[in-house]
Amino acid sequence: MRSGQKLICVIGLGQFGSHIARELAQHCEVLALDSSEKRVNLIVDEVQRALIIDARDFQTLSSLVTPDFDEAIVSLGESMEASILCTLHLKRIGIKTIRAKAVTEDHAAILRAVGATETIFPERETAQRLAAQIANPNLLDFIPLAEDFRVMDVAPPDSFH
């Protein structure tokens, strides 16, 4: 699968996982994995490779995902057990960057403890971004840096023109 592009594995093809796999496939080589045949069939023509597997099974996962992957994204938020086991397995395989979707702060803490390099809360992050844009119509975009610090792209008010 290697062509000089980043090699990314996306595990879990629900709403978030399928969207990120499609976006990444435009610039990276994507291996998309899910236990649902229906979900895999919906994306098979839009990524470089899509397979039906149970990511909780170390033997199966390690036969497909090798340490030469640049990154893995675990989007199994609806099943805490599956996301924790999958993250642990990816760490054992030797994946250096593992981004895992979490549903609670405790879930995120466990994911980090077993090997996730970053935990993500897509719904929370989208809600924060939308709320900031609604509260400040001049806000074009922002990047949170830390708890109380952000880089913001703000349009000047009309009175500045």
Task: Mark where each language-model region is.
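Cytosolic regulatory regions of ion transport systems
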Residues: 1-161
